[in-house]
Amino acid sequence: MSRLLTIRQAEELHKSIIAYLSANNLTNAAAALRAELGLSEEVFDTGTMVKYETLLEKKWTSIVRLQKKIMDLEARTVALQTELNNATPTSLSKRNQDPASWLPKVPARYSLESHRSTVNCVAFHPKFSSIASGSDDSMIKIWDWELGELEATLKGHTRSVLGVDYGTAQSGVLLASCSSDLSIKIWNPSDDYKNIRTLLGHEHSVSAVRFIPGRNLLVSASRDKDLRIWDVTTGFCVKTIQGHSGWVRDVCPSFDGNYLLSAGDDITARLWDITNISNPEAKLTMVGHDHVIECCAVAPQTSYQYLAPMAGVKKEAVSKLGAVEFIATGSRDKTIKVWDRRGSCLMTLVGHDNWIRAIVFHPGGKYLLSSSDDRSIRCWDLSQDGKCVKTLSEAHGHFISSLRWAPNVVKEVANNADSGNGKTDSNGLLKGKDNPPNVQIRCVVASAGVDCKLNIYAN
């Protein structure tokens, strides 16, 4: 008799095996085992058979489930141990105080619910604690991310809202939205989010919209394969850029406003020089993914110190690099690629188990964050060749469609008239280097998904 089981447990096991064999018409085997154990047929009446005939199968399937759960927990333990191993004693104590090394963690500070369908996009107000979300329910909702409260619901679009973005124009901070209804709408936050303009011109769903820094312009990307540049004041389309052969899924302007990065269904990412709006120039086409490119991002200058060595740039030359030196793309092939401006792929980040839906660079420059249809958010350390150092598993209950980092807070400092204007974009690209402004990183990240939720991660 097994020393692992008590006498009662052994008897239960024997009865379960005999009942299982009998239920599956293995009567000879059941009779042989019953004889070997010295059990009479009277022991197995109808009631006993019913009780034990499925017990063995239930035990077996429960063991398989437990084994899977154990394996998942072991994998999570390994990931957490790796994160601990990568952290120095000082970094562990300072991480919460140092914005440059802060990373989001679960649980989220708030999980905001009000949308009735998939939340496709989010955008932070550049100054206040407001955040906008757009949904398949055709609505835009404005929230206070510090308080976790709904402030307003904007109605105007007639189909899914696919993109939102805050930006600073001549008239102040504005909110732009785009939709499957083929329109772009501009809303004025200082006037109760009044819809002040509707831009028409695209011939299919408008998938992304972004303000172009410092130029009173908007750029939009569409399923009609075009990029369009719009004058925010007049609402006129000032230029249509053609080049993609499929749906343009995403567009991202450079921090100085002179370049556009676009990507989409033709499995390419393209860099455009729009210094001269009337004559945009295609500068670069990046090819390397194996499936649709869902998202793209321009690296901030704070990332250059980590990425430049991979591109063969010497340390002393990093400060001389331009506004668009490195970019990242996320694809349905489950990978993220980081490129230099020559079109060389510096690294391919592998780890997600499903489509990559959104990517964002940490304002401090050291990390790249991504979200995926595998319901996780991953943090990649660019100083360690893109190693995944943190995973927020099950960050949402379904696919994660959007991920944004709150823009930096810029505090102007006094400077001489000839020392540069001291201004910076939302990710810290300095425009005046003699007396740079005080740029404060806001440790706030938002994600949104098919579970109809908007999650806020904050320090």
From Swiss-Prot:
Q: Does the keyword Ion transport apply?
A: no
**PROSITE patterns annotated for this entry?**
LISH (PS50896), WD_REPEATS_1 (PS00678), WD_REPEATS_2 (PS50082), WD_REPEATS_REGION (PS50294)
Which Gene Ontology cellular component terms are annotated? cytoplasm; microtubule; microtubule associated complex; spindle pole; transferase complex
Q: Subcellular location, in the record's words?
A: Cytoplasm, Cytoskeleton; Cytoplasm, Cytoskeleton, Spindle pole
Give the main location. Answer: cytoplasm
UniProt keyword annotations, A-Z? Cell cycle, Cell division, Coiled coil, Cytoplasm, Cytoskeleton, Microtubule, Mitosis, Repeat, Transport, WD repeat
Q: Which residues form a coiled coil?
A: 63-88
What are the start and end residues of each WD repeat? 114-155, 157-197, 201-240, 243-282, 288-349, 351-390, 395-434, 436-459
Pfam family, any one: LisH_PAC1
Q: Name one GO biological process term.
A: microtubule sliding
- In this protein, which residues make up the domain named LisH? 9-41
Q: Which Gene3D superfamilies match?
A: 1.20.960.30, YVTN repeat-like/Quinoprotein amine dehydrogenase
Judging by the UniProt lineage, the source's domain of life is Eukaryota
InterPro entries membership: Dynein_regulator_LIS1, G-protein_beta_WD-40_rep, LIS1_N, LisH, PAC1-like_LisH-like_dom, WD40/YVTN_repeat-like_dom_sf, WD40_repeat_CS, WD40_repeat_dom_sf
Output the Gene Ontology terms for molecular function.
dynein complex binding
Instruction: Provide the function of this protein.
Output: Positively regulates the activity of the minus-end directed microtubule motor protein dynein. May enhance dynein-mediated microtubule sliding by targeting dynein to the microtubule plus end. Required for nuclear migration during vegetative growth as well as development. Required for retrograde early endosome (EE) transport from the hyphal tip. Required for localization of dynein to the mitotic spindle poles. Recruits additional proteins to the dynein complex at SPBs.
Q: Which family does it belong to?
A: Belongs to the WD repeat LIS1/nudF family.
User: What's written under domain?
Assistant: Dimerization mediated by the LisH domain may be required to activate dynein.
**Quaternary state and partners of this protein?**
Self-associates. Interacts with nudE and dynein.
Under HAMAP family, the record lists: lis1
User: Which named protein is this?
Assistant: Nuclear distribution protein nudF
* Gene name of the encoded protein: nudF
